[in-house]
Structures are given as C-alpha cells and as structure tokens.
Amino acid sequence: MNSLKKLLVGLEKRFKVSALVAPLLIMGEVLLEVLIPLIMARIIDVGISNHDVGYVVKYGLIMILAALASLGFGVFAGKYAAVASVGFARNIRHRLFNKIQDFSFGNVDKFSTSSLITRLTTDVTNTQNTFQMIIRMCIRSPFMFVSAIIMSFYINSKMALIFLAAIPLIAIPAAIIMKKAFPRFQEMMKNYDLLNGTVQENLIGIRAVKAFVREKDEIERFKIAANAVRTTQVKAEKLVILNMPIMQLVMYLSIIAILWFGGNFIIAGSMQVGELISFITYLTQILMSLMMISMIFVMLVISKASMNRIVEVLDEEVDIKSAEKSKAVSSVKDGSIK
C-alpha cells in the first residue's frame, strides 16, 4: 500500500473527485441490493400467504424501483471508477517518462531498456486495473459482506451463525495461497523483462541477423524467453485457481446447511418461507463478496510486483543532475570557449 500512496502523488483534482464519488455511488448500489431480498421476503410471507394482491403489487413496484435505482448507481459508479483509473495511469506514465528523460546511461543500464519499457506499459496497465478494482470492489465487497451479515442476523440470528463458520474456511486458504503466489508473480515479471529484451535486441539488430543468417538462433532465443514466462505464469496460476473451487465447496456446503436447518425451523414454525429464500440470497451475496475479495487479493499480488517496480524507477537517484539555476546561453561575445 505504501507503493500505491507514492503513485497517487500528483493525481489531478478531477480524477481525485471521480475516485471519491465512485465509492459513494457503490455504497448506494449495495444498500439497495441488500434491501431487495428483504422486500421479496415480505411479498412472499405477507402478500402471497394472505392472498393480498394490492400488497404484492405495491411492494413489487418498490422492488422494481430499488433494482432500477441500484442499476443506475452501478452504471455511474463504473463510469467514475474508469475515469479515475485512466487518469491515475496517465499520471504514472507522465511521471515515469519524465523521470526516465533525466536518466544517465548508467541509470538506464541499471534497469535495462527492456525493463523500462515493461514498466511503462505492462506494469502501468496492471496498476491501473488494480486501482479501478480497489475503487469499485474494495468498497463494494466488504460493504456488501457487512450489510448482508447484518440483514441475516436481523432475519434469524441462529441461522446467521452458519456464515461465521464458513468465513474462516474461505479466508485461511486464500491467505496461504496469496502468500505463496506473490514470489511467483515477481519472478514472472522479471521473465517479461527478459522477453522484451530479446525482442528488442532482435529488432535493433535485424540487419545483422539476416546478414549472418542467424534467424534460427534468434527464434530459439525467443522460444526460451517465452517459455520462461509461460512456466512461471503457470506456476503462479496453479496456486491462484485453487481459490475458486474452495469457495464454491464452502458455498454449497453452506447452502445445504441453511436448507437443512431452515427447513426444520419452518416445520417448527419459527421461520417463514420468504425469510428462508431471502436468507439464501444473503448467503449468495456474502460468499460472492468473499470471492470478490479473494480476486482483489490476487490482483493486488500481481500488481504489487508491478507497483514496486514502478516506484523503483521513480525513487532512483539520477547520476548526473543538471544545475537547478542554469540558464540557456543567449550570446557568446568573442566566440571563445572557457
């Protein structure tokens, strides 16, 4: 997060406003989404059970309006998040490019030209995508999670305990996976640098390659570099993909538990059918929020390496510094050089 704070320095006011407005709209969207299952439960338990058509129509219209309002909040939140993330990436590219212009040959050689190109392109794109996800999903998912938990306790506090049992079963494996995946993504980005360097060398020396008939050797060099990227990416992704099946397993087990206990509560008369249906909806919202949070962590793991690489360039001390108060020479009196 320290890297992200450094990258946010100098962000223009209009992009800061977009970055602040988007989360507010997302919170409005989530509140309406959480209220919809409760309205649906009232329609089933009161309107349909009592054959009250007027009640069903009234609350049905309220539910439709809530859904449309939630859609509107979501659309505008997406727009503002996109504007903020694109402006964020633009700011980083400008800062990187301006910094590189001051680099001496020693500074450039320290990073290599191919690495600087990767940092200006792939790393900035990864950081942009993560920033957009932070604005949207880092607000939406935790807020949805907390709101759905509160509503589930409001409906039936005993049934809500199932969620408290499911959360550690998802959180602990996700934390272990993320911790082990981060070094692998770092290695993958280094291999990207090598791949870009191989392509750059081939393009710069294309005349020499053709003159000395070295095409096959260059193709082999490219294959080795490309396979290194593929191998490290596969190693990292093999860990990350374990998240989804673990979460789905926990989600389905939770649904089974809710249906089992909920059915018994309905038979005992301590719970109504509409409440059980809304409870399942809240379960889906809670577990989907956890799944999205895990995806955010995956993106953070990938982009953390990218952000660190960008900050390395921005924090690099320039070997040769121009005089701060130097003035351009406008005239030379006698043409002599001293």
Question: Could you tell me what each predicted segment is?
Answer:
Residues 76-87, 91, 95, 153-154, ...:
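Cytoplasmic juxtamembrane "membrane-exit" helices immediately C-terminal to transmembrane segments
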Residues 23, 27-38, 64-75, 126-130, ...:
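Hydrophobic alpha-helical transmembrane bundles that constitute the permease/transmembrane domains
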Residues 314-338:
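Primarily ABC-family ATPase nucleotide-binding module
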